[in-house]
Every structure is written in structure tokens, then in C-alpha cells.
């Protein structure tokens, strides 16, 4: 993120000069209308009043809160018209693709434009005959220097339609008019405009006023399915609460789940200060999709603490004009991924077997990936602008050089949780660590204006809080040096053993050709990304090469490969014939290895005895804490 832009944003919020106070009393006005929503565009008119003399620099955002890459939202803007307060046309200059510089105004600048949107998710804009699904950076222009000003947003439904509005924006006396105290809050306020099903529930955490939770559900299901979903969401909310001990004081006392489950929606979840966007092409009626949908609910709701209020300095304040880089996403995103796994199990949605399989997936992804030798978890986090829904058309080496900070962070969270429980005989856990981060950074950070976090953290804070919690600065220092800023992984087998669980090879003694994907393309079975040092890599195969024969057997499908490998033990050298994408035929041998992937199972299922202490530690880790 641009250092100057961040410093300016902080200065604008914390040091209001007299002229700025005057400007703050002239809110930026937006009128958002949907004349022909079936054509996938909407009309926006924005009025900047009391504009200082000189050029007004109007921008379309390039990035969006909760995302870290550039998305260049100006690409969908068209038919831009600019006038002054008396209606005189003005011709803006275009210093770049996402900026309009307006001169010659009379203190008022009115910009109108159309913006296209046809992607229902947490990042973009979607307009059709059923709704307007707005992510504000993809929808609304803003002006440099006016960021501290309040905003007034009016929504105008399509002619003849009665559309409603669900948003974290502050309500007014009109159901179609809302406000935001500043640009940061406005851009962080996704909005659903249309006909949706609304469910609400209220929970008192005993620490302040009761908080109201709203579910604005746009789906093609029944009211009964909506009721069941609302009940599941409430269960997740109640299961999450004990981890932190209290809810954030949501602005306005309300938190909103903006949920779009539609055949044309894209799978996504996006956190915001007092709301979240949930989208999927899956249907609530489909039991096979329930776990994934509820896992996203748990993940995004947890972000209301971890990322929205416990916030890294790398993304606070958020820079809408550049990519946002943070070295702490292993914590912000990864620990959240670990906890969404734990919450859905504690809440009763995922079985023990499914949960242990999910945890094993974290461990396998990190311990077996060659990427761990090239970068640390901190460095993987810094790569987010390249991989977080970022768009590129050239091939990369990510399959061999990158591990998602979601996955690696979840594995780190797992290791730290079990380590704390091990060292303290179950009296201290990662729940306590999150609660400490909440009380030392989240709660103090809420003293700023809505949309601003006053006490973001850095790496030194994360390590310092671990030292404080554990009472052992050397433990915290070593943990960070080895597992976060180094390339090591915790001793998961020993840690699981303390919980009465066994981590073992899933296919011990079985031959293994590696994890390169096999796909049928261009008339043959071809390999995808070949992991460094895997059997096929050692044999000289690379992406796009075609398998012809293995052990003398014609390869016609991936099942053929599995059948051949299943007949041999690790160490067997099989004849291999393949054709490089250049057309060269290669005859060689490939040596099978033992499948290194692990699984995690209860010790009692292996015939081993489980001690009372192990059972107690396991129960303390996995049992529900749900507030009734």
C-alpha cells in the first residue's frame, strides 16, 4: 500500500483542520438507480459539494476491503458525464485509467455514470432483474481529499418494483436512504437491493446492549429452508462468542449476513465491519453443500473480530488505489481458517472424522509442499496481491513455490493450539490467545470513528502477546523464528498423540507416483504441475507431457495409472514412456516412493489405549462451548 496515501488517510481522520470540519458538513451524495436492471448495469450520480478551489481528483477504486490484489473496477464504468452546480458540462482530464481530474467547477461537481456488473460474489458488482448486489469499490466513485466526509446514499428501485435494502450503512427516516461517516466505512459496506427473505435474531452477551443479527437471504428456496439456515447461522454465532468472550460493539448494534445462494452466483465469502457477503451457486436444500456453506459462514463471522477489528497495520487504513500487502495474513486469514474448522465441529455440523480429515489436509499441504523450502509463512502472506483472486494469463510456478496463507496459517494455528494445551495441561489454548489479541488490540482499536481501527498490530505484537500469554518469551521467540519466519513445522505427530490421536501414513507401504494431476487433453493423458523432486519430476516429466505407457501398460486414463502403481511397492522402478509437449518421445524408468500423506484417527480405533488425561485434553479441545 502507498505509504503516503496511508499517512494522509490517518491524518485526515485524526487531525481535522477547520476547513476539513466545514467540508465534513457537506456530505458526498450518491443516487443509485436501476433503470433497466435486466441489462446488468446501474446508474450512479454522485454530488461533491463545497469543493475547494482547484482540481477535484475523482477516482474509481482499484482494490477492495477483504481483497489484497488489484481488480481495476474502472473497467466496467462507461457513459461518464460531469457537470458543475449550475448544470454546465465539464470535461475531465484522464491522467490514468481510474482517475478523472475535474477543473473549472463552481465548488460543486456532479458526476454521473453507468457501471456494468454481472458477478455475484464478495468483490464485484451484480445487477439483474432480481437484485442489485453491490460491493461499493466496484460501484461508487470517490474524490481524493474528501475521504473524511460523510456520505448519503439513496437507492432508487427499478420502475414498478418494490425493492428493499439490506446493508450495514446507517439507516435514516427513509427505507431507501442511508449514510456513512467516512469513505472507509462507505467502501466497506456491501449492499443488497432487491426482494430477499429476512430473518433476525438477538443475542445478549452480558457485556453490553444485546446485538441484533440479520440474515438477508436471496435464494430460490423455500421459507422453511430459510428458517433452517437462520437457525444454523445462530448456532455458529453462539459457538463463536465464547472464544472472544464478547461480541464487538457492532455499529448500530446490528450485524448483517448478506447471503446470495443462486445458480449464477460465484462461491465466495467476504468480511466487513458489521456485515459479511456469502455467495454460492449451491442450494440450501442440498445436504452435500451444507458443510461448505456453513464453513464460510463461520469463517466470515470470525473475521468480525480477527481482521476487521484485530487488524494488521498492512491493511489499515485500506488503500483503495493500490494493492494491499501484509505479512500477517497467516494469522488474519489462516488462524480464521483453523477456527472455522473448529467452530463447525464444536457446533455439531461436522463429524469428528470429517474434522480430523480437514486438519490432516492442512498438515499434508504444508509438510509436503516444496513451496515451504522457498518462502516462510510471513513471505507467503506478502504474496497475497499476486494470488488473492488476482488475474494473470501467464503460467506461474505457484504449484511448487507457494502455499496459501489460509492453509499454512491454519496449520500454524493448529500447531500453536495443541502446543499451548500440551504445555499447560489444557488450561491455556489458542482461544485464550485470540481473546488476548482482542482485549489488547481489538477493543482499544474500536475507540476510533466507524470504519477506522485505532490500534492495528504488527508482527512484534503477535509475538509479544504469545510471550505474555505463555509466560515464556523464549517459547514465543522460538515459535515465531521456526514456524512463521522460518521453514520448520511443528511435531504434529507428538502433539496429536497428546490428544489421544494417531497421525499415521494413510497408505503405508504402498507405492506412489506423486501428486501431479493427470488430465485428458489433446488426445492423451497429460500431467499438470509436477511437484519438485517427486517421482515423475525425477523421471524428467513436466507439465503438458503425455503419458504413453507405464510398466508396459498403455495408459488410457488416470485409473490405469492407479491400477499399475497399486501392484508395486515403494522402490519399484517401472518402465515409463512419455512424449514431451515438444513431440520428443522419452523412454526411461520411474522409481515409486511411499505415499507420504498422513491421516489422523482416534487412538482407540487403532487398538491403542487412551489415558484419562488424553481424553480430557481432547474433550477440552473439541467440545462445544456454545452459549445457550
What do the predicted segments below correspond to?
Residues 7-19:
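Bacterial N-terminal signal peptides
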Residues 19-26:
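Boundary at the C-terminal end of the N-terminal hydrophobic targeting segment
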Residues 73-81, 116, 148-166, 179-185, ...:
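Zn2+-dependent metallopeptidase catalytic core
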Residues 42-74, 138-158:
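Surface-exposed beta-strand/loop patches in extracellular or lumenal glycoproteins
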Residues 112-196:
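Extended, low-hydrophobicity, Ser/Thr/Pro/Gly-biased non-transmembrane segments
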Residues 34-35, 66-128:
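A surface-exposed beta-strand-loop module
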Residues 340, 350-628:
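C-terminal recognition in membrane/secretory proteostasis and scaffolding
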Residues 201-329:
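Juxtacatalytic substrate-recognition/specificity segment
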Amino acid at each position: 500500500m502507498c505509504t503516503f496515501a496511508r499517512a494522509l488517510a490517518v491524518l485526515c481522520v485524526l487531525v481535522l483542520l477547520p476547513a476539513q470540519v466545514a467540508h465534513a458538513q457537506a456530505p458526498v451524495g450518491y443516487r443509485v438507480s436501476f433503470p433497466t436492471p435486466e441489462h446488468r448495469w446501474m446508474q450512479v450520480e454522485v454530488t461533491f459539494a463545497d469543493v475547494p478551489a482547484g482540481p477535484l481528483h475523482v477516482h474509481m477504486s482499484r482494490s477492495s476491503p477483504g481483497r489484497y490484489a488489484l481488480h481495476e473496477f474502472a473497467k466496467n464504468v462507461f457513459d461518464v458525464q460531469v457537470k458543475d452546480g449550475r448544470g454546465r458540462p465539464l470535461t475531465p482530464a484522464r491522467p490514468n485509467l481510474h482517475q478523472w481530474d475535474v477543473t473549472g467547477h463552481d465548488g460543486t461537481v456532479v458526476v454521473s455514470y453507468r457501471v456494468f456488473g454481472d458477478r455475484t460474489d464478495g468483490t464485484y458488482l451484480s445487477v439483474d432483474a432480481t437484485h442489485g448486489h453491490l460491493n461499493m469499490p466496484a460501484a461508487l466513485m470517490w474524490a481524493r481529499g474528501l475521504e473524511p466526509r460523510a456520505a448519503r446514499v439513496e437507492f432508487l428501485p427499478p420502475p414498478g418494483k418494490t425493492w428493499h435494502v439490506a446493508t450495514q450503512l446507517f439507516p435514516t427516516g427513509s427505507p431507501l436512504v442511508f449514510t456513512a461517516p467516512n469513505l472507509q466505512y462507505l467502501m466497506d459496506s456491501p449492499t443488497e437491493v432487491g426482494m430477499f427473505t429476512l430473518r433476525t435474531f438477538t443475542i445478549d452477551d452480558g457485556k453490553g446492549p444485546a446485538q441484533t443479527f440479520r440474515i438477508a437471504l436471496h435464494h430460490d428456496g423455500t421459507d422453511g429452508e430459510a428458517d433452517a439456515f437462520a437457525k444454523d447461522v445462530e448456532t455458529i454465532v453462539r459457538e463463536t462468542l465464547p472464544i472472544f468472550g464478547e461480541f464487538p460493539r457492532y455499529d448500530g448494534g446490528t450485524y448483517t449476513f448478506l447471503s446470495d445462494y443462486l445458480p449464477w452466483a460465484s462461491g465466495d465469502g467476504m468480511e466487513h465491519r458489521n456485515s459479511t457477503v456469502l455467495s454460492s451457486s449451491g442450494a440450501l436444500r442440498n445436504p452435500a453443500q451444507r458443510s461448505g456453506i456453513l464453513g464460510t459462514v463461520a469463517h466470515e463471522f470470525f473475521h468480525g473480530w480477527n481482521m476487521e477489528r484485530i487488524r494488521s497495520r498492512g491493511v489499515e487504513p485500506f488503500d483503495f488505489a493500490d494493492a494491499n500487502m501484509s505479512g500477517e495474513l497467516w494469522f488474519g486469514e489462516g488462524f480464521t481458517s483453523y477456527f472455522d474448522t473448529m467452530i463447525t465441529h464444536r457446533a455439531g455440523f461436522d463429524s469428528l472424522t470429517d474434522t480430523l480429515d480437514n486438519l490432516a489436509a492442512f498438515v499434508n499441504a504444508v509438510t509436503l509442499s516444496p513451496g515451504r523450502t522457498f518462502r516462510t509463512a510471513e513471505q507467503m502472506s506478502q504474496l497475497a496481491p499476486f494470488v488473492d483472486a488476482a488475474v494473470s494469463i501467464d503460467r506461474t510456478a505457484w504449484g511448487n513455490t507457494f502455499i496459501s496463507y489460509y492453509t499454512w496459517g491454519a496449520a500454524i494455528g493448529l500447531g500453536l493450539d495443541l502446543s499451548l494445551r500440551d504445555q499447560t495441561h489444557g488450561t491455556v489454548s489458542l482461544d485464550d490467545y485470540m481473546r488476548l489479541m482482542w482485549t489488547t488490540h481489538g477493543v482499544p482499536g474500536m475507540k476510533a470513528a466507524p470504519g477506522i481501527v485505532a490500534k492495528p498490530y504488527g508482527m512484534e505484537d503477535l509475538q509479544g502477546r504469545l510471550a505474555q500469554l505463555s509466560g515464556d518469551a523464549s517459547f514465543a521467540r522460538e515459535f515465531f523464528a521456526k514456524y512463521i519466519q522460518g521453514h520448520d513445522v511443528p511435531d504434529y505427530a507428538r502433539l496429536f498423540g497428546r490428544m489421544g490421536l494417531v497421525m499415521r501414513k494413510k497408505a503405508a507401504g504402498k507405492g506412489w507416483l506423486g501428486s501431479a494431476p493427470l488430465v485428458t487433453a489433446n488426445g492423451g493423458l497429460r500431467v499438470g504441475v509436477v511437484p519438485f523432486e517427486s517421482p515423475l519430476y525425477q523421471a524428467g516429466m513436466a507439465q503438458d507431457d503425455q503419458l504413453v505407457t507405464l510398466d508396459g501398460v498403455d495408459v488410457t486414463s488416470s485409473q490405469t495409472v492407479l491400477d499399475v502403481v497399486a501392484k508395486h511397492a515403494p522402490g519399484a522402478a517401472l518402465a515409463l514412456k512419455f512424449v514431451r509437449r515438444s513431440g520428443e518421445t522419452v523412454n526411461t524408468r520411474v522409481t515409486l516412493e511411499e505415499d507420504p500423506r498422513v491421516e489422523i484417527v482416534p487412538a482407540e480405533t487403532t487398538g491403542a489405549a487412551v489415558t484419562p488425561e488424553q481424553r480430557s485434553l481432547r474433550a477440552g479441545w473439541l467440545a462445544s462451548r456454545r452459549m445457550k
